[in-house]
Amino acid sequence: SWEWWHDARLYGVDFRSGYNMDSYKYYIDFASKFGIPYIIMDEGWAKSTRDPYTPNPTINLAELIQYGKERNVKIVLWLTWLAVENNFDLFKTFADWGVAGVKIDFMDRSDQWMVNYYERVAKEAAKHKLFVDFHGSFKPAGLERKYPNVLSYEGVLGMEQGGNCRPANSIYLPFMRNAVGPMDFTPGSMLSAQPEDNRSTRANAMGSGTRAYQMALFVVFESGLQMLADNPVYYYRERPCTEFISSVPVTWDETKVLYAKVGEAVVVARRKGDKWFIGGITNNEGRTINLDLSFLPAGQSFTLTSFEDGINADRQAMDYKQRESKVNNATQL
């Protein structure tokens, strides 16, 4: 769960929302209810972006870490790269505090010094059993293979860019950006809009594309750390959608591409254990794609729960239809 995208603007609650104790406990409670293992405390948790040791006066970090621990939810802290560089002993300190990982931001360059910085960070974080999410980063080049505690990188025009993030561009990402490594796209908008209707602001963050499209992104895009970027108030309201996206794994045992045409559409099937997840996205143009489920094990029947664009999704992007059906390896969809 991530508060920055919607500026921690909770509502319908009996406390003043923002970057404060009551709000973060609300995020922890939400994450716990849906089995989400982490919350990210983004820019605003610290008194100064230069000081990684002093929370802002509204935050008792030790209390929040303990509150989360009691509910099986761990905390990830956002930092600027320079604060990390100037306080490189913070990894030990954060580990001692019980922090799970760090989200490091604003590198915004890829010269040799910065490339070396990434590895120094990954190595030091691994030494103290912390994971790393590189935000404001260049695209990955394999560092996560040597340091598997590097879970994701931004390096993409993702949902943080509001209305500028459109399906017509994002359809290329599975073929290009995500092909070279994990991608912190931050999907999950419940306030979905067709691109021409997107009026996203920090107060009312919106995602372009239909509701079903937003849900499919969790399957199509790979990231070792996925965000539920939207307001928990919306997620509570849209429980079937939330239950699905919070159930999608972030690591996979098997992946099959069922359909792919660059710039037009892609459909992938991914397996974790004995469960299969299928996700498909387009460039926002409607199309019919026939899917062959012959990859399923022979002699077994599966219950398919699907989330599909509703009949009016082209006019109101939040329109979707949920249905269940029995399928097997002879089924054609």
Please tell me what each predicted stretch does.
Residues L130-G136, M159, G163, M227-Y236, ...:
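Acidic/polar loop patches that form or flank catalytic/metal-binding clefts of enzymes
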Residues P195-F221, Q226, R271-W276, I281-R287:
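Long hydrophobic segments that form regular secondary structure
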Residues E324-L333:
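C-terminal beta-strand-rich structural cap/linker in extracellular carbohydrate-active enzymes
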Residues F295-I311:
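Solvent-exposed beta-hairpin/edge-strand motifs
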Residues S1-E70:
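Conserved structural scaffold segments of CAZyme catalytic domains across common CAZy folds
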Residues V262-Q300:
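Carbohydrate-binding surface patches
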Residues M41-T210:
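Aromatic- and carboxylate-enriched substrate-binding clefts and catalytic-loop regions
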Residues D230-F277, D314-M318:
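Glycan-recognition and catalytic regions of carbohydrate-active enzymes
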